[in-house]
């Protein structure tokens, strides 16, 4: 059975120490989250560099606070340093957190936003050059210029039946 852990410290240094100790005790990976504390990219980097073998995952990166190209850039970069690979966990968070805490539009349709974001992230990670003026994000010949070390699985945080259906 695979057993992973979530970040527990209040500082990146505490997280690094905790992750190293947990891996020695049998944990096989680390998951990082983001609301208004530690930045998840920094936390994921620390986790990846603290592990000897384990995977790192995001639980979750809110899709409204980073565009799909930036998400793909982060995932590809983290896949290069996480010894067991990187899992990109995405979600829509909540309207209160996205609009009230992050001062950005939550959107009218979380399902459409998720479908669009996952499609674009996967296409970027697969090396595709994208021109798109449909939906939330507009791109003009955008392309990821770094390759992931491992194929990056995309996990979805689902809060209703239609999102569960999309997640598979």
For each feature predicted by the language model, list its residue ranges.
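Internal, glycine-rich beta/alpha segment that forms the wall or movable "lid"
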Residues: 14, 72-168
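Short glycine-biased active-site loop of nucleotidyltransferases that positions the nucleotide triphosphate
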Residues: 48-49, 69, 146
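Generic structural signal for helix capping and beta-alpha/helix-loop junctions
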Residues: 39, 66, 95-98
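Active-site beta-loop-alpha junctions enriched in small/polar residues
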Residues: 8-10, 33-35, 61-63, 91-95, ...
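Structural motif corresponding to the early beta-alpha repeats
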Residues: 60-70
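N-terminal beta1-alpha1-beta2 module of alpha/beta enzyme domains
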Residues: 1-59, 152
